[in-house]
């Protein structure tokens, strides 16, 4: 039973780290990356559809994304969806391809993005600590039911704390890498 609690905590913490990594990937740096447009939904026959389902997103060069839309009647809708997103991008269409030049980030915008990234990292840390709290309370419940000893509880709590420290360290490493990426000119 204790092993199940530990494994569950470990997998949930790993999911928290992965979710934090995915949230940080959405933050725009100076470099073009297809995942930048993952959050954009395009109205397709009245249904909000992810951009990658209506077109192929690729990197043209380090500061330009290109979208090849599958259905040419969707070009205007894709452009409108990109412009109305909070990414601050200005698409240009050329035939069946939409090019999106990424403007260079200003120093002020970089600092704002670093604040956003730090907030995401803190949310990830909080999620990991919540998993730790849940796991520790599950172990204490086992002790109350006399299914394990006090020594088992202490040992398990120490192991769960080690998992927590390791996963928070991963989040901190992701944060450091993202901050360095944002500060690159």
From Swiss-Prot:
It is found in: Cytoplasm. Pfam families: RRF. GO terms for biological process: cytoplasmic translational termination. One of its GO terms (molecular function) is ribosomal large subunit binding. Keywords: Cytoplasm, Protein biosynthesis. GO terms for cellular component: cytosol. Responsible for the release of ribosomes from messenger RNA at the termination of protein biosynthesis. May increase the efficiency of translation by recycling ribosomes from one round of translation to another. PANTHER family: MITOCHONDRIAL RIBOSOME RECYCLING FACTOR PSEUDO 1 (PTHR20982:SF3), RIBOSOME RECYCLING FACTOR (PTHR20982). Belongs to the RRF family. This is Ribosome-recycling factor. It comes from Shewanella loihica (strain ATCC BAA-1088 / PV-4).
């Amino acid at each position: 039973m204790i092993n199940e609690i530990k494994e569950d905590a470990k997998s949930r913490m790993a999911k928290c780290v992965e979710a934090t990594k995915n949230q940080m990937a959405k933050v725009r740096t100076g470099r073009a990356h297809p995942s930048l447009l993952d959050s954009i939904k395009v109205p397709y026959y009245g249904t909000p559809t992810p951009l990658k389902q209506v077109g192929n997103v690729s990197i043209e060069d380090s500061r330009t994304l290109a979208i090849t839309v599958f259905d040419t009647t969707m070009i205007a809708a894709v452009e409108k969806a990109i412009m109305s997103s909070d990414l601050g991008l200005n698409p240009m269409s050329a035939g069946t391809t939409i090019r999106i030049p990424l403007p260079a980030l200003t120093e002020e915008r970089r600092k704002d993005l670093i604040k956003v990234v730090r907030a995401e990292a803190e949310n990830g840390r909080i999620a990991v600590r919540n998993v730790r709290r849940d796991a520790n309370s599950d172990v204490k419940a086992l002790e109350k039911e006399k299914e394990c000893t006090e020594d088992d509880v202490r040992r398990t709590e120490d192991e769960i704390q080690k998992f927590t420290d390791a996963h928070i360290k991963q989040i901190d490493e992701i944060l450091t890498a993202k901050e360095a990426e944002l500060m690159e000119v």
